[in-house]
Amino acid sequence: MKKITYMIAILSAISTSIVFANDREEVLVTSSILGLNTSQIENPIHIISEEDINKSGTHSLGESLDNLIGVASTDFGLLIGQPVIRGLSGPRIKVLENGLVNRDVSGIGADHPIDIDLNNIQQIEVVRGPSSLLYSNGALGGIVNVVDNTISKEDLADREVKFGIEHNSVNDGKVHNINLSDNLQGINLSLAYKHANFNNFEIPDEAVIHEPGHTEEEKDHLENSDAKTAAYKTGVSIVEDWGYFGVSFKNIENVFGIPFHGEHDENEIAQYGEERIESSTDSDTFNIKGSYDISGNFINKVDYFYSDTDYSLIEAHIGGKHNGEKTTFSNDAEEFGAILDISRNDLTQKIVVRSMDEDTSILGEEAFMENVQSEEESIGYYLGAKISDFHLDFGIRRDEVNRKSKFNNTAYDIDTDSTSFVLGFCYELNSFSDLNLTLGSLERAPSSVELFMNGAHAAVQRFEVGNPNLKSEESRNIDLSYNFDNEVFYGTINFYQNDVDNYIYRVDTGQTDTAGSEPSNLKIANFVQKDAELDGYEIQFGTDFDFLNGNLGLTIGRDSVEGTFIDGSNIPRMVPARDIYTLSYTEDNLSVDIDLTEVNAQSDIGGVGDSATAGFELLDLSVGRSFALEGVEDFRVILFANNLLDEIARNHTSTVKNEVPLPGKNLGIGFRVTL
């Protein structure tokens, strides 16, 4: 906290001799069920633009958000990273694309990627805490919504063609993309394509920590950290006085190495040779979205949606003792629903209904879970009202979840009903500040993995055992925040407490599997429950002012969360505290961004299988410049650097943090052309 105090003092001193510029953009938050924009929302939320995403090169979704207050990442290599919000991850965080849940198998294994392409997006919306219930598919911990304009809700005015090229030094990575949008005789058309190829990424000396008793030649790169991606998406829509209607199709194919699948015995390597674990994914997603303006006595408007996803991931052994063995993970899902606008006068009211069917299967050599059939039905009511100096938001949702599968040859048909609600108050203290209180009670049904996992999971070197008798998690939340923007400084201070009954987590038993499964002698880990509490805070201050011929912006922030069980022990792999500093300068067609993230050491470990993690500093730099060329709307060159200090860095939240550190220093260049 001393660093924050010092920085505030520095900002205060600067403010005595500069001219401030307060011009923060207002953005529509598409995932807001109540249809709010950023000036109307006081919930803990981040909005990240496409420009901000492109400043630092291509990363996984988790790593792209890792420098945001209250948001971290758990990773399994360069392109495999899942977001962590206020210490919660996995099924407690929902990843959405245009408001619809992303239906892949990233929840089954830490080595599985989130199947979302960040090419040609408009923005990413991150909602933290219980207020996420007021947004599309709100979850116990928060949501991440990736927004693009594949299905345009407004007529496109002009044709736009974009080209992009990127190169990264840390893995000799090359990225190419081309995007087109146009209106052809009243039909809005969107096309986007990306191809990426990354070799093994470089790591600092002595970055890999091997298991006790295992030695290996140190290398300057991480084996099997390569990846290839090909993604395209297309959509069409029509917009009329009555509303809009659109369809879209998306395909993503990945081929990537798994950088850790357990340490191999030297005698086995001598006999069978080196082994490579390679995964390939193929997904097709078809969406329908639309809106119809009824203007009736009860219903004003209906927004509707339908989504069909066909996803597969094949994990194959190439070389070594298990050469040719494969495991196929599949997920087929359908989801549909509607949002009914029944607002009256100054009272915003919405009713949301959803239905989802999902079939998840694992076939092959490492089929550690039986096929699971899931059905989910939900209905929710949402209200927003302005009462004097108060703004009130309320949401309540009823969920019914059914899962069918087998566990130890016993068939299970599990029904789980839950009710969640959130109540938010915003009091306007004066023209530049407000105080917000959010109270929430949210429930979460156990996931398929938590219920039915039962087998060897080599990626995490565990024999994982689920429990069909797990109860629903019940979370009670208090979130208090103060926001201000007085044309000199702006900032937010958040304090929160999250009491979770029946918190589900995986714990090592200290025993090993000796039943002859492959791989052999894996540590046994059970999914169990215990009451838990997460307490934390998020502080961020900023200012921007005229400087030289442009505008200079400074922000400082800190986030911290502690997670403990009712018996006083620690929740495993909890996010360490962080200090985040950013400096940005813009002048006409020039932009410069410097980001420094100081990640504190984490010594509050959570029992067997968890270990302390050293702190580190990540320094990132980005410089962008646009040039005027004849016949070109914009030609922009971006120079960027990641981990400029070449620090040994590892995410404490990762199950393979020792064997799979973060990449070393990366220097990159990108070109963006808009016609």
What feature does the model see in each segment?
Residues 223-229, 243-301, 308-333, 360, ...:
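Flexible loop and strand-edge segments within Gram-negative outer membrane beta-barrel domains
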Residues 224, 327-339, 378-380, 465-471, ...:
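Outer membrane beta-barrel strand-and-loop segments of large Gram-negative receptors
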Residues 385-392, 495-500, 517-605:
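Gram-negative outer-membrane beta-barrel transporters
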Residues 62-104:
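Extracytoplasmic beta-strand/coil segments of soluble accessory domains associated
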